[in-house]
Amino acid sequence: MAAALLLYLPLLPGLAGAFNLDAENVIGRRGEPGSLFGFSLAMHRQLQPQEKRLLLVGAPREKAFPSQQANRTGGLYSCDITSSDTRCTRVVFDEDTDPKMESKEDQWMGVTVQSQGPGGNVVTCAHRYEKRQYVNTVQETRDIIGRCYVLSQDLTIKDDMDNGVWSFCDGRLRGHEKFGSCQQGVAATFTRDYHYIVFGAPGTYNWKGVVRAEQKNQTFYDLGIFDDGPYEVGDESRQDKNLVPVPANSYLGFSLDSGKGIVSQDEMTFVSGAPRANHSGAVVLLKKEKNQRALSLEHMFEGEGLASSFGYDVAVVDLNSDGWQDIVVGAPQYFDRSGDIGGAVYIYINQRGKWEGIKPIRLNGTADSMFGLAVENVGDINQDGYPDIAVGAPYDGFGKVYIYHGSKNGINTEPAQILDGEKTGTNFFGYSIAGNMDLDKNSYPDIAVGSLSDSVSVFRSRPVISITKSITVQPDKLDLKKKNPEDPSEIWMDVKACFQYTANPRNLNPRIKINYTFEAENERRQLGLPSRVRFKDYLSDQFTASTTLIGQNSKRCVTAKLVLQEKIKDKLRPIPIAVSVNIAGLESGSSSTRKERALPDLIPILNSNESETKITKVEFLKEGCGEDNECHSNLKLQYRFCTREGNEDRFTYLPIENGIPVLVLKDQKDIALEITVTNNPSDARNPQKDGEDAYEAKLIATFPDSLTYSAFREMRGYPEKQLTCGANQNGSQAECELGNPFKRNSNVTFYLILSTTKVNVDTTDLDINLKLETTSTQVNSTAITASAKVVLELLLSLTGVAKPSQVYFGGNIVGESAMKSEDNIGNLIEYEFRVTNLGRPLKTFGTASLDIQWPKEISNGKWLLYLMKIESKGLEKVSCQPQNEINVLHVAESHNSRRKREIAEKQLTDSKTFSLFSERKYKTLDCKVNAQCVDIRCPLKGFDSKASILLRSRLWNSTFLEEFSKMNYLDILVRASISVPAAAKNVKLTNEAAQVRVTVFPAKPVALYTGVPWWIIAVAIFAGVLMLALLVFLLWKCGFFKRSKKDHYDATYHKAEIHAQPSDKERLTSDA
């Protein structure tokens, strides 16, 4: 079949809201337990011998009459709901039994019941009625042929030929292949023209099923018309199963309805469901064949879901009132793979008798609800001109009945009302439904709902009325300069509202008490804004009172005084005044359509298609605006970013790069945004075009997460300063009121001071949304974005120190495997790097890191500095990476490092006494030249102003003995720097790298002094003394020690002094 339009009920909000079926004053009737009282229902109007409006209830498991020679046979009950007697009366018929010919045990009388209409007949059936032959013999046979009874309008069997038993399968060929299991009466109905009675027999022809229509109108006989039927699927004369348009086990005739205007406006069409046809179900449209006694196929609708029982129930109803009957089909066992759908109803909207290619509307029920087990034309229950339908879902909780209203488009797919069995305490509520008749005589059709719990509920329809509302205000325009002459301190308005109602039918004229509510400024109140007016007698902007409407089209008017509040801001937008109504009840003594009523009148309900509220608006006479009383403003905005010097109100514009302001943020706490707003005419040659007063003019500034509002400074304003600014709780938005009104040719310049404390390393831009708003007409009110680029300048310093700065090596060479304690490695060296922040707290920029180039090995891979441990001061617990470079050999820590360092320093001091005579050899060990280094990164978590990283290390003694024993000393360089993640984008880092130098000396000059014999020293001393003696002797021989005359002495002295240069002593000293 064609794909269906879907509607899933649980997705619709507010479906439980009631419309005009009264769910509070439900009329209930109960039957005998276990009787299935309420299995079938029909409303019947008796005209003779007296008028009665009855509810007929089938109870197919009711106990038998004594004369029926059975336990349970089923029965039919008549209920007068207008009576104070809550008991229903059992209809007496089918009392006798011939046990030799039949069995009525469990025949299920009352399985179906239908009324022909006002003054018409009633049909009820027992589809399990058994026809017997050869009782108490071995040839005994039992055929479940079923049969029906037709009763006259007063529920009795007349002697007329059309009353009594109707059993067309009786006397035909037996066996399930023919008519032996035809089960006539599973469904039965009358055509609406009173001409035919229609029976369904789904067990005929191996449960193919047949539909039979027989003439049922006394008028035909009076007119001499005797040859109108009967008509039957398979042909009543030929009884040919091959003419049945569905396969075996289809159950054709399981549900029935009929009507004209289905295929043709003049011809009757019979509609029947076959819920097991082709394993999914089908609905067939049947027509009478001329000159034959056959019903033949006109069209077939096929179910779309396997085992969905499509056609379990059908209803013919003109939903859109276009004169063509539409078709409603129930498929209570439809489901989908998701498991969310439990039953469906298909709505086929008639296209002027054309059914090919029609796409049905599918209404879906909730899971396991059996939605669509019963579908019923319940008439126009709200009297809107479109018939309505009811859908039963007996397994939806306690059971529910969904009411859908017809409309000009076919059907409103949202239920107008849901009746719930839980409220009546009824299980399996909605198994059967009857309607389309007014039981309580208020001109609105009512609904009866049956169940499998031996109970029936009747829901009466409340009259639907439409109340016309009008509201006027004097004066209709407010002049703020014109005060009330009675009280010059106030401005008054007179409000008048009038009401009248209409209803269907036109003769329905109850006296209705209504509650009316005057309400002003509802939208402002919902926004949390104060109202600009109040009602004088109630000191509030709303009040409720009551009045009475005495009948249809009778007008009733009420008045109230409205007072304008003082010092209002909004002087441009109109003041809305609304009046709404609801029905409070009926006044005592209210007349109805009938003078005497056994049931109390129901309170009418307002038409749901009409608004309960009527609104009018009062305009202001506006100053500074054009002759059209409309204000056309021309607000313009300019902005510039500034820095603020300290806490003083001195502002400096930011530098511009590529057209974008650049904010270099060091230690500033605030920045400022200079804003200028003007309201000048856009065209000086046509100043009346715009630039008029801007009422409630304001600027709304929305800041990014990195900025918060701090304050504002108004620098200048023309013609007067009237600026006020305020912010929301977290400072993310500021609102500045420019003036009310911000007059023509006004301008204002002010600064928004913004805190930068939330600016962090991820902040690359500042985008501030600026929007001008006014209640005047502003042609261009688009928001603009003020943008600036952010550069963060970090003022960080880094210093480093090593303790001690000079160490020694010496002793014996020890292998790596022998290192058990750090003392075995070598002397202790502790490095400390101090980081100081001179600018903004670093926490706002994220996490900085200290990067250290650690000289781990010399160029040939031998150990240089062994890193034992890393600690911190002024930080959270430090975790440097890579962790596997710390104490790689897992040697034990030593706690005597201080003493060993002091001994080392003393030995180093002693060893320096020999350096005078050493050859001065030295070397620098540097990561950039001859050392293999590891990059160690230490995050400075929690760092704010000061922090220190301490590295505890050991000089690898054996490496220095092996590689550097001939060196007088060596320098080891360790470098460190600071980095910040994402610094390349917007962070300017001004720190300098730190370099720490440690000098290493050998413990003693091993290669210079080891192995010198003692005798060499003695010979050297003797040679020195001998040479000194020889020198003295030579001087004596030369007369050096004699006294001479002065002139000779002077010459001799000079000569001797010349010969003594250079002296032996000086030469020896030089050689040494």
Swiss-Prot record:
A motif (GFFKR motif) lies at residues 1039-1043. Residues 1037-1072 are cytoplasmic. Ca(2+) 3 binds at D438, D440, N442, Y444, D446. Glycans are attached at N71, N217, N278, N364, N515, N609, N730, N747, N780, N957. Ca(2+) 2 binds at D380, N382, D384, Y386, D388. Ca(2+) 1 binds at D318, N320, D322, D326. GO terms for biological process: cell adhesion mediated by integrin; cell-cell adhesion; integrin-mediated signaling pathway; leukocyte migration. Disulfide bonds join C79-C88, C125-C148, C169-C182, C498-C557, C625-C631, C725-C736, C880-C927, C933-C938. Heterodimer of an alpha and a beta subunit. The alpha subunit is composed of a heavy and a light chain linked by a disulfide bond. Alpha-6 associates with either beta-1 (ITGB1) or beta-4 (ITGB4) to form ITGA6:ITGB1 and ITGA6:ITGB4, respectively. PANTHER family: INTEGRIN ALPHA (PTHR23220), INTEGRIN ALPHA-6 (PTHR23220:SF9). Belongs to the integrin alpha chain family. This is Integrin alpha-6. It comes from Gallus gallus.
